[in-house]
């Protein structure tokens, strides 16, 4: 550029072209397109649920990092992750249970969509690690967590569904032969739908929420 007032063309992290001067950019690096996307301004502020709104809380649960998304009448309004680094499985399960109670209490969903668990396929081969077939221990760990989440929803009188992975992926048109390819495909789709770049856990949770909000309707809860 020739001087501080020369127009520059730069690209933001989301791939949008920004036309501005270095005088402005060096003070505040801001993309006008991203600024208008409310999903880019994710905060901890709880959005009150409007009357007659159907709200879905979707979970891509795991014992260390769980993705979540919240939809109001098929519209994504919030997404993120919950992380815990506690050493014992039961401690992590308890932390996620308490987090779910907090999310339900604060966000007041009509439905909680939980990703169903599945045994990981190993290409027809049994691969042993110690005295366990690889995949079985992870399956058991996720089964424990799934049961805890289901029981928590039951105790709080919240409707819930289990979303089989192949089902929600087919609904969202997630492609790919390998697990890594399907994870990447979900991230690309989220970028296409909402113009946001998200983690694998967030992408899956957003896909689960999209599937649940577009295919399931249950009674609306009259929260006090």
What do the predicted segments below correspond to?
Residues 1-45:
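Functional cation/ligand-contacting sites centered on basic and imidazole/sulfhydryl donors
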Residues 43-224:
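Phosphate- and other anionic-substrate recognition elements at nucleic-acid/protein interfaces
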């Amino acid at each position: 550029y020739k001087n501080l007032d020369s127009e520059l063309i730069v690209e933001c992290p989301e791939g949008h072209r920004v036309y501005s001067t270095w005088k402005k950019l060096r003070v505040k690096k801001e993309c006008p397109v991203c600024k208008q996307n409310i999903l880019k301004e994710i905060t901890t502020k709880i959005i009150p649920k409007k009357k007659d709104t159907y709200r879905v809380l979707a979970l891509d649960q795991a014992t260390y990092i769980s993705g979540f998304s919240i939809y109001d009448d098929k519209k994504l309004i919030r997404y993120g992750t919950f992380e815990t680094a506690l050493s014992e499985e039961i401690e992590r399960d308890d932390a996620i249970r308490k987090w779910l109670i907090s999310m339900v209490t604060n966000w007041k969903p009509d439905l909680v969509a939980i990703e169903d668990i599945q045994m990981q396929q190993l290409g027809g081969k049994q691969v042993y690690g110690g005295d366990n077939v690889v995949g079985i221990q992870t399956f058991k760990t996720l089964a424990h967590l799934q049961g805890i989440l289901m029981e928590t929803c039951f105790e709080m009188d919240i409707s819930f569904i289990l979303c089989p992975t192949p089902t929600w992926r087919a609904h969202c048109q997630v492609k790919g032969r390998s697990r890594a390819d399907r994870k990447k495909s979900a991230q690309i789709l989220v970028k296409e739908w909402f113009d946001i770049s998200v983690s694998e856990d967030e992408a899956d949770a957003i896909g689960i929420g999209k599937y649940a909000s577009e295919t399931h309707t249950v009674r609306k809860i009259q929260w006090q």
